[in-house]
């Protein structure tokens, strides 16, 4: 996701530079345009280097490390949820629905 946002910002910068280059010749002063182009190049280099510093080197190499399953949710909470589900599945359906409250007809319930 971070890589996608950095690519979008890079494309926007390149698009703005390209759009500025299309300005009519009479609106651009040669000396001023050289200064602006130098400043723009420096700005673009700073932005690109900042974006590349934020990106991990493994992403640049094309290696995306898999996220371990345990990092998403601790084992205790998964076991606890499974135990609650097993207890509720042993009850009849009417008893399982008892703690839930219907707020509106045919919409959502809160358990």
From Swiss-Prot:
| Compartmental location | Secreted
Keywords for this protein: Cleavage on pair of basic residues, Disulfide bond, Hormone, Secreted, Signal
Q: What is its main location?
A: secreted
GO terms for biological process?
Answer: adenylate cyclase-inhibiting G protein-coupled receptor signaling pathway; regulation of cell migration
| First and last residue of the signal peptide | 1-19
Q: Which InterPro entries match?
A: Somatostatin (IPR004250), Somatostatin/Cortistatin_C (IPR018142)
Name of the protein in question:
Somatostatin-1B
Tell me what organism the protein belongs to: Carassius auratus (Goldfish)
Organism lineage: Eukaryota, Metazoa, Chordata, Craniata, Vertebrata
